Amino acid sequence: MSNFDLSCSKNFITIEEQEELSQLAVDYLQQGVLQANPRGPHRYRAKIWGTEYCTPIIMKIGKRIIEHFKIKGCPVDPHLGWIISLIEKGGQIHKHRDKYAYHEQNNVKHLRCNIMVTRENSTANPVIEGRIIDVPARAIWGFIPSESEHSTQLVDVEKPRIVYQFGFVVPMDYTLPVN
C-alpha cells in the first residue's frame, strides 16, 4: 500500500438532499438514463454534466463542492465530467487508476469529489490504494484518481449504493483541503 491524499467530510449534504438525490438516481435508472456499465455487472452510470439530467440540486451541490475544495475557476473535467453511479448487490468497481491523455498533455490533475448518497453497509465503502475507507452516507470524499488505485469491495446490499461524482481539472500543485 502506498500513501495517498484524501479529503473526507461528513454531513456534506442534508438529509433532504440525500433523499432527493437518491430518488433521482432511482428514477433515472428506471427511465433508462443510467446505463449498464460495460466494466461489470450490476453497475449503472450516467454522465450528466452539460445535459438536461444535471438538475438544479446537482448544480447547487456542485457549487458547494467548488467552495469546499477551493477550486473556483477550475473547469469540470472534460473526460468524465459529473456522473451518477449506482451499484446493486453483486456489483463492484475493479481496481484502476483514471489516467487520461488530456491531463498529461495539459499538465493538470483530475480531482474527483464523490458524495456517498446511500450506503446500506460497509461493503459500499471505497477502497483506495488497498485501504478500505469508511465513508458514511451524506459524506464527500475527494482524491486524485490518476495517482491512486481505487475500487470497491463486492457490494452486498439490498438497496443500491448511490454515489454522485464531480470531476474537475486542477493545477499540478493543487492540494486537497485538510479536514
Listing of model-derived features with the role each one plays in the protein:
Residues 71-95:
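A short glycine-rich, His/Asp/Glu-containing loop-to-beta-strand
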Residues 119-179:
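Catalytic core of Fe(II)/2-oxoglutarate
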Residues 6, 110, 159-161:
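A general secondary-structure signal for short beta-strands and their flanking turns/coil
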